């Protein structure tokens, strides 16, 4: 019996993502110095769109940070992880889930507004602000696969995608309608969604990491607030 491997590959990618694997770390290991940190308590429902941190789209813990205005980069850093260290070699890894827009510290080039739990690993809360920190970007220690949620209010004429639970940073999200051979790139918003007005019928979402890997998931029709498991996760040798 002759097996059509090409057909099998097409069937697999129509439902779950096949990753173009890469063996190198997509992050620069250069340590950035001169960072600072404060802490805040209103951590749920941050600007990155993850909602409640222990909810279905959140990281599942409170090891998070709101990024200063410059570091936030209009939402491009949402869902990415940073290992922050102090001069005493204490370190903590946090995920970016929010932006810090207040005047003052949040306007510094490399400022993190941490959860009280994360802040306390680096210094006493009584200090209020920590200076002289360093950081490096690292893969996120997530469990399971990359997931996609369709924004509340999505319909057959407009929808917006939240990509979450990704171990490696997302570079681009694109969609391809059923019957088309062309992927249309979407533009990320400052609140970390990827909107589209061409979602009639079945379509495929393609998620590209900064390491050049791709994950695919087919969405048969638009259902507001529905979460899709892509069945795949980005790899990393970091």
From Swiss-Prot:
Residues 45-145 form the Expansin-like EG45 domain. It holds the Pfam family DPBB_1. Its main location: secreted. The keyword 4Fe-4S does not apply. Keywords: Disulfide bond, Glycoprotein, Secreted, Signal. SUPFAM superfamilies: Barwin-like endoglucanases (SSF50685), PHL pollen allergen (SSF49590). The keyword Transferase does not apply. It is found in: Secreted. CDD domains: DPBB_EXP_N-like. Disulfide bonds join 48-78, 81-140. Glycans are attached at residue 89. Residues 1-21 form the signal peptide. One of its GO terms (cellular component) is extracellular region. Belongs to the expansin family. Expansin A subfamily. May serve to lubricate the movement of the cellulose microfibrils during cell growth and wall extension and/or may serve to maintain the fluid state of the slug cell wall. This is Expansin-like protein 5. The lineage of its organism: Eukaryota, Amoebozoa, Evosea, Eumycetozoa, Dictyostelia. The gene is expl5.
